[in-house]
Design a protein with these regions (language model features):
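An all-alpha helical bundle fold corresponding to the catalytic cores
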Residues: 1-272
Length: 273
């Protein structure tokens, strides 16, 4: 069967470029990473010393619980992004079911998004180890992630990825209906244990879903933080997250409107013929 022509969205992402401070992603490191992230991280209570736990107030215990939730959910997010890459994106290219250009439009900047989340996860992991699993200060880590040049870069990458989400889902659905080999590949990939019974249509939206969680988690950490300077800096990082989320939402709306108009134009053209 002849492969259908690729109908891309009206706007294409810019070239990937590089993060202001991060190294270029090393793709060969990602596959072992998927194995590394297969098991959930150990809860902080099981790793902290009994003496350290006994000294914590009720409010500080709650703070540590939310920090642990941020860490554990970032771990889970890196894992699912790696599944998207290693179970779907790379094999689709290897099997020549999608070209590199098509993949760059369906999964724009996926490699760099994984690297950014992985670096954030590693910075949280280092805090846990340095503080014997009872984290004293998290404000610098989260401000470095969501504020300043790194925050701007994160916003740029996530805007590209999330704004193509609706179009990507539609393109994949269309390909599955028209191309038997493509459909068989997707079904086989979705059956792999790494997907944990999720379909590709469930995995693609995870970046947008993750962006909605950061402000809530950071506000909850700030609410349970006694030190006023630390509290203020965490609230600043939460505000940075809200700005990123609002910007991404606007980009998503713009692209969805373009996608709808493009679809209507194609339908009207086909009807006239």
């Amino acid at each position: 069967m002849e492969k259908d022509s690729f109908e891309g969205p009206l706007l294409f992402p810019e070239g990937p470029g590089h993060s202001p401070t991060s190294p270029t992603p090393q793709l060969e490191e990602v596959e072992p990473r998927l194995l590394e992230f297969e098991h959930d991280p150990t809860n902080w209570r099981e790793l902290a010393s009994p003496e350290g736990l006994s000294r914590l107030s009720k409010k500080e215990t709650k703070r540590q619980e939310v920090i642990n939730e941020l860490f554990a959910t970032e771990h889970a997010h890196v894992r699912m992004l790696s599944v998207l890459q290693m179970v779907f994106s790379k094999p689709l290219e290897r099997e020549e079911l999608l070209s590199s250009t098509e993949l760059a439009t369906i999964f724009p900047n996926l490699d760099e998004i994984i690297e950014m989340h992985y670096n954030f996860y590693e910075s949280l992991k280092k805090l846990r180890l340095d503080d014997n699993f009872i984290i004293k200060s998290i404000s610098t880590t989260v401000l470095n992630r969501f504020g300043g040049p790194e925050g701007d870069w994160f916003q740029k990458l996530t805007s590209r990825f999330c704004s193509h989400q609706s179009w990507a889902l539609d393109q994949i659905k269309s390909r599955q209906k028209k191309e038997t080999r493509f459909n068989s590949f997707i079904q086989e990939a979705e059956s792999k244990p790494q997907c944990r019974r999720l379909q590709l249509k469930d995995i693609i939206p995870i970046e947008m879903q993750r962006l909605t969680k950061y402000p809530l988690l950071l506000e909850n950490i700030a609410k349970n933080t006694e030190d006023l300077k630390e509290k203020d800096r965490i609230q600043q990082s939460a505000e940075c997250c809200r700005k990123i989320l609002n910007h991404v939402n606007e980009e998503v709306k713009v692209m969805e409107n373009l996608f709808v108009r493009n679809t209507q134009s194609i339908t009207q053209h086909a009807f006239r013929q």
